[in-house]
């Protein structure tokens, strides 16, 4: 089996072009950062409450006795906040792209601290992006007085989050059942 290395910076640039993410879009995302980050904790709480409703995602945040693991939950929320802080800056550098691919590897690999757990199902990664799309859109429309600007900013965020899907799922795309 011959493996081809993906040139992630080139692929990312192609996706940015494909979805039409412009420099103006990136500036709108950056300008919305204070609003988004001021509410990042509540966004995170909403997402984690949703994850707890599904046994296949809940298993990553509970003890062996199915009790919520406060430390693991808080550590994971902090990781999500780190992603959000990086994301609101709308960076295009190779480091950010490698970071996204690294996040994919982290979710795809068996957790060292819980060897009995499977990889995180990829549907939850794409589902979380969907939650953020919806929550950010709601925040923008609720807190921006200029509805046309809120709409343009929401569209920019939608493009930006969709560009991240492929690198965030990179480890899953290269996964083969017969490994």
State what each model feature region is.
Residues 29, 73, 125, 129, ...:
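Hydrophobic packing residues in well-ordered alpha-helices of helical domains and bundles
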Residues 1, 51-54, 161:
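Short low-polarity hydrophobic stretches
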Residues 2, 9-30, 34:
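Serine/threonine-rich, low-complexity linker/repeat segments that form flexible spacers/stalks
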Residues 3-16, 142-179:
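Short terminal or interdomain "cap/linker" segment that borders an active site or interface and mediates
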Residues 12-15, 19, 37-139:
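Heme-based O2/NO sensor domains and their adjacent alpha-helical segments
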Residues 24, 31, 68, 120, ...:
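A structural signal for alpha-helical segments
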């Amino acid at each position: 089996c011959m493996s081809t290395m993906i040139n992630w910076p080139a692929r990312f640039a192609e996706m940015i072009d494909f979805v039409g993410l412009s420099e103006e879009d990136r500036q709108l995302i950056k300008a919305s950062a204070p609003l988004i980050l001021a509410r990042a904790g509540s966004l995170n709480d909403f997402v984690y409450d949703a994850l707890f409703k599904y046994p296949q995602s809940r298993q990553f945040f509970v003890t062996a006795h199915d009790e919520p693991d406060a430390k693991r939950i808080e550590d994971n929320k902090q990781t999500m906040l780190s992603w959000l802080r990086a994301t609101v800056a709308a960076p295009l550098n190779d480091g950010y792209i490698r970071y996204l691919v690294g996040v994919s590897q982290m979710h795809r690999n068996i957790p060292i601290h819980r060897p009995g757990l499977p990889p995180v199902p990829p549907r939850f990664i794409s589902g979380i992006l969907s939650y953020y799309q919806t929550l950010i859109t709601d925040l923008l429309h609720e807190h921006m007085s200029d509805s046309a600007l809120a709409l343009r900013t929401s569209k920019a965020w939608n493009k930006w989050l969709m560009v991240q899907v492929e690198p965030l799922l990179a480890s899953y795309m290269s996964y083969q059942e017969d490994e």
